[in-house]
Regions:
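Local cysteine-cluster metal-coordination motifs and their immediate loop/turn environment
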Residues: 117, 192-193, 214-247
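Nucleotide-activated chemistry modules centered on ATP-dependent adenylation/adenylyltransferase
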Residues: 201, 221-222, 247-258
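Ferredoxin-reductase
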Residues: 2-83
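Structural signal for conserved beta-strand scaffold positions within catalytic alpha/beta enzyme cores
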Residues: 8, 56, 157-159, 211, ...
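Short, charged beta-turn/beta-strand-edge "cap" motif at the junction between a beta-strand
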Residues: 41-45, 91-96, 233
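FNR/FR-type flavoprotein reductase catalytic core
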Residues: 73-216
Length: 258
């Protein structure tokens, strides 16, 4: 475990917060798609840590930026913490995204809070032109658009209600782009309905699709088996631990209905 001091903890969109922390010790190398496991405060400290996606890294300053959504008592307690408060954080954890050998172009597909870890993908490999396709519930729920725009070759947006970008689904934006652009890899994170639609869209195209799964976790290091997911293994299926074997998997090998 490591102590990290809060540098900033601010609301950046509807129910979305950005948390920047600086570690007391040297931050290990971070792979995009890895996560931080944060112990939450309280009169009686909450038993389970919360997994938060790593959004931005300043390695030279040992600083991580995490983005989280208000979902319950734990994240509400976290949102009340102020600059200078010390947190107990395990990071970086898990297996992140990887850039395939020879990849010259990429697409980034994110939905809601799932867009957060994809900023780290864009910033990790600036030499690879990447187009970003982001979907949100509404304009008020969108965040960090200027950061995504700076790091992307092109940024396309959609919302459920049409208040920002096009009204519709982010996978429709990707489908249209693929009529004119060839991508060597797709990086994705978002809600299950979005991932199912992405599976249908990409099946049979021969393009690798790496997905970061969002699951509640217990230990965060693979010991408790709380965060299992079903993954194709040859002609069979096996259960894998999202925290240790993932959170990044081959989307075409993940059973999203299980």
């Amino acid at each position: 475990m490591s102590r990290a001091v809060i540098l900033r903890n601010a609301q950046i969109a509807a129910d979305i917060y950005e948390l920047s922390v600086q570690f007391e010790g040297t931050l290990p190398p971070v792979q995009p798609g890895q996560f931080a496991h944060v112990k939450l405060p309280g009169p009686t400290p909450m038993l389970l840590r919360r997994p938060l996606g790593i959004n931005h890294v300043l390695a030279e300053l040992d600083v991580l930026t995490l983005v989280y959504q208000l979902r319950g008592q734990g994240t509400r307690a976290l949102s009340a913490l102020e600059k200078g408060y010390f947190l107990d954080i395990l990071a970086p954890l898990g297996r992140g995204f990887s850039l395939p050998d020879g990849a010259k172009t990429a697409a980034v597909v994110g939905g809601g809070i799932g867009a957060a870890p994809l900023r780290a993908v864009l910033e990790a490999w600036p030499q690879v032109p990447m187009d970003s396709f982001l979907g949100f519930r509404c304009g008020a729920a969108s965040y960090q658009l200027s950061s995504f725009a700076r790091a992307s070759r092109e940024l396309r947006l959609c919302t459920d209600d049409g208040s920002l970008g096009r009204q519709g689904y982010v996978t429709d934006l990707l489908a249209e782009a693929m009529e004119h652009n060839a991508y060597d890899v797709v990086f994705a994170c978002g809600p299950t309905p979005m991932l199912k639609a992405l599976q249908r869209l990409m099946r049979g195209r021969g393009i690798p699709v790496q997905v970061s799964l969002e699951e509640r976790m217990g230990c965060g290091i693979g010991g408790c088996l709380v965060c299992n997911c079903k993954v194709k293994y040859g002609e069979d299926w096996r259960y894998r631990r999202v925290c240790a074997d993932g959170p990044v998997f081959d989307l075409m090998e993940v059973e999203l209905d299980g």
